[in-house]
Design a protein with these regions (language model features):
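Intrinsically disordered, low-complexity acidic/polar segments
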Residues: 15-17, 61-63, 95
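An amphipathic, aromatic/His-enriched active-site/gating alpha helix that lines ligand/cofactor pockets
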Residues: 23-36, 55-88
Length: 95
């Protein structure tokens, strides 16, 4: 399995819009080919930071998802979200 791990900076003045957008994002990601599991979280120590981790069956599926996320930067910006990191990770173990 492969995961796309992201870190994001959030404009907290747009929190309501981000919460609404997240519902649609999660629903859409669930439909992605090879989707296994996803997590969207907010950093406890830095509330304007979000951490995401989305797992796919294959490297190719994860790469395609990462490309789609990168291409979606304008919509992210419209919601007060800026990407600070986006990594492809090979899952070594799960529990």
């Amino acid at each position: 399995m492969y995961a796309v791990a992201g870190t994001w900076r959030l404009d907290l003045s747009m929190r309501e819009l981000q919460a609404q957008a997240l519902k649609g994002i999660v629903a859409g990601v669930r439909q992605s080919p090879g989707f296994v599991r996803g997590f969207w979280s907010r950093d406890v120590d830095e509330p304007d930071v979000s951490v995401t981790y989305v797992v796919f069956e294959t490297r190719e599926q994860a790469l395609a998802f990462r490309s789609a996320v990168e291409a979606n930067a304008p919509a992210q910006a419209d919601s007060g979200v800026s990407r600070t990191g986006l990594r492809l990770a090979e899952v070594q173990a799960d529990a």
